[in-house]
């Protein structure tokens, strides 16, 4: 009965001992500079911007204000991949046949006894308990084999947080301006605008996962862009577009078997969960929004504010 219980327990330990997914958690970004990362980040940003509903801005002249969360960092996964060689170890030994012959010395003892005219003679043969000669002979060949599994563990993730990358921010700002232009919406300086459009980029970075099981392994890289936008009429301070959220995720995945491969590589993009907290449920205390719209920092994006040089230049031109 105990053996029946022990077998499934050992089997479960064997199956589950090396299974799991390690996720590096960088601060905002993950270091996104090689080609696949660039492709994923650009795809998620394009999808999020392209999905913006701008119908209410048709025929209007808008001023854009874009704020981006710091997004640049670096990270690396070390260790973790396992190879066939000590989670479970067994050995098979094939030894040759060995025969040893011993030669022991023998000696003879004779004893004569006389008593009352009777004489007795006793002869005995003894063997000395120490071989005088030994001979060992082997027959056949010998072999030894072993099989095991070497587990490298789940690995270690290391990351470094840097300041906002101005090129990433400028690229995202240009994507927004391109979509507005293609939609037939004029983007002008704040002095000539009748509508203010505010876009907050909350998530703009990468996620890397590693899945390790005994037979199946996978490396996954994801890029996410999550933004919230709204538009305000400068004349009456009413919201033309209430706060809306767009969130998209692009993924690149490599599938392995015993870390051999990859036998399959896939890429894709899809909508993902929105922001943990958004402003869609905020209502003004009065009948309209505040008299002053959120201001734009006059420092450029190189100082860590997330506005592109073009937006800052337009804002400065509109100042008296």
From Swiss-Prot:
A lipid is attached at residue 19 (S-diacylglycerol cysteine). It is a lipid-anchor. Residues 288-298 have a biased composition (Polar residues). Residues 1-18 form the signal peptide. PROSITE patterns: PROKAR_LIPOPROTEIN. Residues 288-320 are annotated as: Disordered. It comes from the Bacteria. This is Adhesin MafA 3.
